[in-house]
């Protein structure tokens, strides 16, 4: 089975085309600046790279050109569109309705549109991508894989906020969590590497990209996660504040004469390590570099970043009453030996964790980074959300399922 995986953002589309018999990537790429001047597609097959620069007025336009590349004689994955068996879509928010990946029909589309108010920046472009693929590849099944679904079985004690219950009933205000596809892939892969029974294990997954979150995965289910009603809660991120005292919002509105939207923008776009370094950078590579040179501002930002991560790891060990393994993933998690080492040595040595410096100093390569006598194993596991989406799509189509339960 050949599956095209599509991830539609507001002005970009990431895609991968996979042969699921071998789980090999046939070709992949990125369409960017959709609907704005300078739009282009960067397409790759093996070691070949093609850049197509042409106007793309909307997502349908962009996906039409993507499909042309997928069947291109030289850089495509197949010769004919009929060889695309299914399309898997990343969808950010499934609300409370979707606890697993689903085969898309009109009923599902209505539900996705209904839940768009919970993810107004992300769900609408996801929906545009689905509609476009239905039109461009009529008769080809489409599957939605949700960022929120893996966390949907959290107990109420983990997902409810201590605000008047009527707001949960009226607006479904609760913890949803995000990065679920990544946390699911990394936790499963961690269990495989260590030879653990996934459904009898306690794993903490630490997804550190520009957006960052941690999940407590117990017996194969996410029982808690650091992101909440939106991706703003939890860890200190590139530009997001993570956890703050909620009264700071009203305080800033009053003192600075700001609207709710302006404060929201500050917390989402101007905070995190960007805010802590007074606008220097939101990129942890820049901050690490300066911190290692002795810059006190960047060193403090790195300390705050690592301290918050360590606190969440400690909290989730308590939530699961123990831990078998901790796995780092995503851009920072995979490529920052110093972050992994400092978190484990400065805060988690009480667990009997012993980092193997030689193993830890390798970037982006799947491995155990602790010594053989480390009581708790720590791993570097590169995430692969596209493969997870393709696997779900294949399983749903081959088994004739309407919905996949994790």
Swiss-Prot record:
GO CC list: cytoplasm
Site residues (Transition state stabilizer), renumbered to this chain: 179, 240
EC number, UniProt record: 2.7.2.1
Cofactor details (free text): Mg(2+). Can also accept Mn(2+).
Binding site for substrate: 90
Residues the record lists as binding Mg(2+): 7, 385
Pathway: Metabolic intermediate biosynthesis; acetyl-CoA biosynthesis; acetyl-CoA from acetate: step 1/2
Keyword Metal-binding: yes
GO BP terms, alphabetized: acetate metabolic process; acetyl-CoA biosynthetic process
Cofactor: Mg(2+); Mn(2+)
Subcellular location: Cytoplasm
Cross-referenced InterPro entries: Ac/propionate_kinase (IPR004372), Aliphatic_acid_kin_short-chain (IPR000890), Aliphatic_acid_kinase_CS (IPR023865), ATPase_NBD (IPR043129)
Keyword NAD in record: no
GO molecular function: acetate kinase activity; ATP binding; magnesium ion binding
EC class: transferase
Catalytic activity of the protein: acetate + ATP = acetyl phosphate + ADP
Quaternary structure (record): Homodimer.
Function summary: Catalyzes the formation of acetyl phosphate from acetate and ATP. Can also catalyze the reverse reaction.
NCBIfam families, per database record: ackA (TIGR00016)
Family note: Belongs to the acetokinase family.
HAMAP family the record matches: Acetate_kinase
Protein's name in the database: Acetate kinase
């Amino acid at each position: 089975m050949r599956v095209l995986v599509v991830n539609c953002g507001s002005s970009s589309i990431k895609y991968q085309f996979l042969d699921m018999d071998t789980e090999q990537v046939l070709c992949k790429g990125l369409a960017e600046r959709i609907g704005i001047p300078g739009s282009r597609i960067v397409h790759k097959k093996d070691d070949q790279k093609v850049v197509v620069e042409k106007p793309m007025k909307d997502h349908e336009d962009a996906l039409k050109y993507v499909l042309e590349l997928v069947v291109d004689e030289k850089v495509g994955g197949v010769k004919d569109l009929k060889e695309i068996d299914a399309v898997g879509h990343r969808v950010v928010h499934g609300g409370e309705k979707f606890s697993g990946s689903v085969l898309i029909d009109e009923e599902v589309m209505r539900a996705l549109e209904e839940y768009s108010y919970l993810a107004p920046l992300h769900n609408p472009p996801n929906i545009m991508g689905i509609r476009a693929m239905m039109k461009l590849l009529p008769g080809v099944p489409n599957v939605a894989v949700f960022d929120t679904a893996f966390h949907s079985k959290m107990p109420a004690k983990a997902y409810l906020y201590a605000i008047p219950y009527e707001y949960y009933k009226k607006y479904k205000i609760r913890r949803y969590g995000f990065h679920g596809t990544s946390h699911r892939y990394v936790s499963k892969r961690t269990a495989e590497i260590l030879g653990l029974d996934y459904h009898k294990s306690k794993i903490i997954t630490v997804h550190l990209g520009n957006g960052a979150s941690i999940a407590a995965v117990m017996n194969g289910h996410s029982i808690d996660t650091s992101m909440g009603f939106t991706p703003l809660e939890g860890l200190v991120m590139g530009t997001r504040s993570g956890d703050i005292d909620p009264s700071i919002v009203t305080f800033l509105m009053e003192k600075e004469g700001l609207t709710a939207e302006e404060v929201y923008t500050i917390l989402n776009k101007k905070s995190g390590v960007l805010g802590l370094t007074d606008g220097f950078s939101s990129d942890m590579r820049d901050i690490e570099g300066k911190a290692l040179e002795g810059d006190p501002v960047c060193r403090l930002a790195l300390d705050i970043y690592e301290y918050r991560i360590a606190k969440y790891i400690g909290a989730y060990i308590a939530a699961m009453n123990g831990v078998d393994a901790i796995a780092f993933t995503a851009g920072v998690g995979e490529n920052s030996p110093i972050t992994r080492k400092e978190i484990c040595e400065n805060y988690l040595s009480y667990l009997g964790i012993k980092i193997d410096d030689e193993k830890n100093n390798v970037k982006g390569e799947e491995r155990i980074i602790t010594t053989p006598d480390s009581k708790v194993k720590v791993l570097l596991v590169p995430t692969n959300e596209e493969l997870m989406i393709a696997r779900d799509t294949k399983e749903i189509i081959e088994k004739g399922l309407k919905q996949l339960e994790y």
